[in-house]
C-alpha cells in the first residue's frame, strides 16, 4: 500500500486517481501508523513552504516522515518535493524535513514570468532513461 500524505496542502485526489488508474493500492492519510505500515510514501503539495511545514507539525507527521523515508521509497511532488530539503526561503526562512541536504531558494525572475505554467519543448541536458519514450522534442506541461 502507498500512503499519500494528507496534510491539507496537496492535490491529493489527482495523485490518488493516478495510482488507482495504474492499479496500485493507495490510501489518503494523515495517520502516523498508516504511514509506518505503508510500503511507500508520496508527499504531494500545493501552497507555501512555511504553511505546509506548519501543517505537518500540527499533525505530528514530521518525525514519522523523517524516520520512514529512510526505510521505504519516498516521493515528493511539487511542494512536497521542496519540503524534503533542509530549508526553504519562500516568504521566510523555514526548516524543512531535512531528508536531503540543501535549500530551496527563490528563482530570480530576470525578466521571466515566475512561476511559469504552460507547455514547453523538452531540452535534454543529459541522457535519462525515464525520458527515452518521450522523443527528442516532446512538449510537456
Which residues make up each language-model segment?
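N-terminal beta1-alpha1 ligand-phosphate binding loop
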Residues: 2-24
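Short, flexible loop segments at the rims of nucleotide/cofactor-binding pockets, characterized by
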Residues: 18-25, 51-55, 117-121
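Structural alpha-helical scaffold elements that stabilize or flank donor/cofactor-binding regions
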Residues: 34-35, 68
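An anion/phosphate-binding loop that grips the pyrophosphate of nucleotide cofactors and donors
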Residues: 38
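Structural motif
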Residues: 42-44
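Cysteine-nucleophile active-site neighborhood
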Residues: 47-117
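Active-site oxyanion/phosphate-handling segment shared across diverse enzymes
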Residues: 119-141
Amino acid at each position: 500500500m502507498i500512503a499519500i500524505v494528507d496534510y491539507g496542502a496537496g492535490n491529493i485526489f489527482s495523485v490518488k486517481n493516478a495510482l488507482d488508474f495504474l492499479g496500485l493500492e493507495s490510501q489518503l492519510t494523515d495517520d502516523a501508523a498508516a504511514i509506518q505500515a505503508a510500503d511507500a510514501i508520496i508527499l504531494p503539495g500545493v501552497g507555501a513552504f512555511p504553511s505546509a511545514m506548519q501543517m505537518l507539525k500540527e499533525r505530528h507527521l514530521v518525525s514519522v516522515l523523517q524516520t520512514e523515508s529512510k526505510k521505504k521509497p519516498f516521493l515528493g511532488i511539487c511542494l512536497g518535493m521542496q519540503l524534503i530539503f533542509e530549508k526553504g526561503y519562500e516568504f521566510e526562512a523555514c526548516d524543512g524535513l531535512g531528508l536531503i541536504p540543501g535549500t530551496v531558494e527563490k528563482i530570480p525572475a530576470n525578466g521571466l514570468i515566475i512561476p511559469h505554467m504552460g507547455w514547453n519543448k523538452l531540452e535534454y541536458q543529459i541522457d535519462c532513461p525515464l525520458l527515452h519514450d518521450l522523443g527528442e522534442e516532446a512538449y510537456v506541461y
